Amino acid sequence: MDPLRAQQLAAELEVEMMADMYNRMTSACHRKCVPPHYKEAELSKGESVCLDRCVSKYLDIHERMGKKLTELSMQDEELMKRVQQSSGPA
């Protein structure tokens, strides 16, 4: 696969993952903060605050998980390099 095509696929996957995260966040926060039967067309103060906190927490956790996964991936790469170096040519 040529580098340009690989870059395009990576960009498409990133967009798909971001859309999925947005949809899951929206659904989870809506379920948590907005009652199934609306009383008014506008969000109440409590609903608005709940949604703000929910989205903030969701994004914070997503960022923390991303950093941790990157860290673990880098550790795995280092371990693989060490294993390859130690089992080098015989």
From Swiss-Prot:
Q: Which Gene3D superfamilies does this entry report, sorted A to Z? A: Mitochondrial import inner membrane translocase subunit tim13 like domains
Motif stretch (Twin CX3C motif)? 29-54
The SS bond pairs are: C29-C54, C33-C50
Instruction: Kindly give the membrane topology term recorded for this protein.
Output: Peripheral membrane protein
Pfam families the UniProt entry points to: zf-Tim10_DDP
Q: Which UniProt keywords apply?
A: Chaperone, Disulfide bond, Membrane, Metal-binding, Mitochondrion, Mitochondrion inner membrane, Protein transport, Translocation, Transport, Zinc
Membrane-spanning regions, if any? none
Protein name, as recorded: Mitochondrial import inner membrane translocase subunit Tim10
